[in-house]
C-alpha cells in the first residue's frame, strides 16, 4: 500500500534529509560521537549559509554547547577528577600560563594522603618559582585566607566516583575550600563511562571541565558526550608538552578545527 499523500495546504514540518554520508557527518562519526548527536550537529551546520565546513560546524557547536574558559587571571579554583587524569599537571600548566600573563599565583594541595602528589606539584612549583601550601583537611582549607589579586589553584586527590565515602569526603573539602570546583577529564575514554563519571562531579558543583591528553588521542567522542548529556561548559584543553605550553582555550572555532583534523 502506498503511503498517504500529504494533505493539500499543510506544511511538511519534517526535517530535510541530510546528504547521504556527508563529509561532515563522516568526520564527526569517526570520533565515536553517537549518531543522534552527529546528525543534530550536521543539521544545524547545514542550516548556515556558506560552504566553509569549519565555520558552519563552529556555529552549530556554539548553538548547542557552552564555552566558558577559566582564563586563570583571577579567582579561586578547586580541581577534581578521577585518579590519573592529569589534575596536577593541568594545575601546573595553568599556573605557568598565569605567571606568563604577569598574574600572582597561589598553589595549594589538599592531596595529603599521597606523598607523590605533593612532590609532583612541588617540582612544578619550584620550576615556576612558587611555593606550595598544603591544606590536607577541611580545617586547613577553611583557614586559607582569600588573597585579592591572585589566582588560587587547589589540587585534590583523585577519587573513585562510585565510592560514596570518597564523594562525601571530596564534597566536604570542596565546601571548605570556598572555591569553584572544576572537573578535569582525560580525553580518549569510553563515552558512557566518561559521562557517568562527569555526572558525579557535576552533582558536586562542577559547571566547567578541562580536557587533558588532547595530543595523544585521535577521537573526541567522550569529550563531546559530556556537554551533550550534562550541559557543563568547555573550559580549557591541555596537551602534555612543555610546562609553559599546551594550554588551549576552548572555543567553538577551536573545537570545530579539532573535530575536522585529518587523522
Language model features with spans:
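Short strand-loop junctions, especially beta-strand C-caps/beta-turns
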Residues: 82, 110, 157-159, 186
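Primarily NTPase-proximal linker/entry elements flanking Walker-type ATP/GTP-binding cores
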Residues: 1-113, 120-138, 142, 146
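N-terminal loops that bind phosphate or other acidic moieties
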Residues: 100-103, 152-153, 158
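Conserved catalytic-core segment of NTP-binding enzymes
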Residues: 120, 133-146, 151, 159-263
Amino acid at each position: 500500500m502506498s503511503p498517504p499523500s500529504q494533505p493539500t495546504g499543510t506544511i511538511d514540518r519534517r526535517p530535510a534529509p541530510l546528504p547521504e554520508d556527508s563529509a561532515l557527518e563522516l568526520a564527526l562519526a569517526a570520533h565515536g560521537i553517537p549518531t543522534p548527536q552527529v546528525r543534530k550537529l550536521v543539521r544545524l551546520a547545514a542550516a548556515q549559509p556558506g560552504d566553509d565546513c569549519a565555520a558552519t560546524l563552529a556555529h552549530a557547536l556554539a548553538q548547542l554547547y557552552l564555552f566558558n574558559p577559566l582564563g586563570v587571571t583571577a579567582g579561586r579554583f578547586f580541581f577534581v577528577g578521577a585518579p590519573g587524569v592529569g589534575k596536577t599537571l593541568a594545575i601546573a600548566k595553568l599556573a605557568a600560563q598565569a605567571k606568563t600573563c604577569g598574574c600572582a599565583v597561589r598553589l595549594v594541595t589538599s592531596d595529603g594522603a599521597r606523598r607523590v602528589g605533593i612532590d609532583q606539584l612541588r617540582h612544578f612549583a619550584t620550576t615556576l618559582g612558587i611555593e606550595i601550601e598544603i591544606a590536607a583537611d577541611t580545617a586547613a582549607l577553611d583557614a586559607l585566607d582569600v588573597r585579592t589579586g591572585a589566582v588560587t589553584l587547589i589540587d585534590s586527590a583523585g577519587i573513585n566516583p562510585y565510592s560514596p565515602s570518597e564523594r562525601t569526603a571530596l564534597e566536604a573539602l570542596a565546601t571548605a575550600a570556598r572555591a569553584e570546583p572544576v572537573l578535569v577529564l582525560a580525553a580518549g575514554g569510553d563515552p558512557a563511562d566518561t559521562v557517568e563519571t562527569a555526572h558525579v562531579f557535576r552533582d558536586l558543583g562542577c559547571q566547567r571541565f578541562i580536557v587533558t591528553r588532547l595530543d595523544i588521542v585521535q577521537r573526541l567522542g567522550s569529550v563531546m558526550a559530556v556537554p551533550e548529556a550534562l550541559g557543563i561548559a568547555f573550559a580549557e584543553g591541555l596537551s602534555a608538552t612543555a610546562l609553559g605550553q599546551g594550554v588551549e582555550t576552548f572555543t567553538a572555532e577551536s573545537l570545530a578545527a579539532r573535530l575536522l583534523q585529518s587523522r
